[in-house]
Amino acid sequence: MSRLFTLVLIVLAMNVMMAIISDPVVEAVGCEECPMHCKGKMAKPTCDDGVCNCNV
């Protein structure tokens, strides 16, 4: 039973470490998806050089 508990603790510790170490990736939204991407933010979508910008 203690081996199982130790294994669970190791797995949980590894998950926490991976969450801390991994940096958040900013998803680039293309011009095609721009209107749907900005719709939830109540912003006006504009596309500059293939990159979506949501202007409030």
UniProtKB/Swiss-Prot annotation:
Keywords: Disulfide bond, Ion channel impairing toxin, Neurotoxin, Potassium channel impairing toxin, Secreted, Signal, Toxin
Region forming the signal peptide: 1-19
SUPFAM superfamilies: Scorpion toxin-like (SSF57095)
Keyword Secreted set for record: yes
GO molecular function, one term: toxin activity
Keyword Kinase appears in the UniProt entry: no
Disulfide bonds: C31-C47, C34-C52, C38-C54
Record InterPro entries: Scorpion_toxin-like_sf, Toxin_alpha-KTx_8/9
Cellular compartments annotated: Secreted
Tissue: Expressed by the venom gland.
Entry GO terms, CC: extracellular region
Superkingdom of the source species: Eukaryota
Propeptide intervals in chain numbering: 20-28
Free-text comment on this protein's domains from its UniProt entry: Has the structural arrangement of an alpha-helix connected to a beta-sheet by disulfide bonds (CSalpha/beta).
Biological role: Potassium channel inhibitor.
Family: Belongs to the short scorpion toxin superfamily. Potassium channel inhibitor family. Alpha-KTx 09 subfamily.
Name of protein: Potassium channel toxin alpha-KTx 9.8
